[in-house]
Amino acid sequence: MNYIPELKKYYKDSVIKELVKEFEYKSIMQVPKLEKIVVSVGVGEAVRNKKLLDSAVLELSQITGQKAVKTKAKKAIAGFKIRQGQEIGAKVTLRGNAMYEFLYKLIHLALPRVKDFRGINGNAFDGNGNYSFGITEQIIFSEIDYDKIERISGLNVTIVTTASNDKESKALLLKFGMPFSN
């Protein structure tokens, strides 16, 4: 038998039924679902120190359980001494079971470890049902060994859903247990 993540099982068993009732969908195919989660980190100092970018890629891979890809600058920015095509960050795109595992780990294990945590901003939707937020310290994830990190850095998380608007997307994420402050 194949392994099914807890959050995916919960989505299929409970969330779909609750959202059909709440939004009165005619078919369960209309119910919004998670499409992908993109976790990225920008390393501005990588211009001067390539070792920081390599450690960011390693940390991102440890956090997500999937190999991170280095990202390149789209255009040159003289003020930051960045040339076009220069590697300045890393990202991971999670889909399928890995996506549900990461979301579970984020909601139930990592975010509660943030000092003075009161929830994340519930207004950071983009109008198309996608939600983005930043995490200020990568050390909230248990996979990161505090003694072995080069420097404390933040990361960006974008949750892409099939919802057509923000209201449906927020309802979906609330059902998953996303700790919104408002």
Swiss-Prot record:
This is Large ribosomal subunit protein uL5. It comes from Borrelia garinii subsp. bavariensis (strain ATCC BAA-2496 / DSM 23469 / PBi) (Borreliella bavariensis). It comes from the Bacteria. Belongs to the universal ribosomal protein uL5 family. One of its GO terms (molecular function) is rRNA binding. Gene3D superfamilies: 3.30.1440.10. GO terms for cellular component: ribonucleoprotein complex; ribosome. The keyword Lipoprotein does not apply.
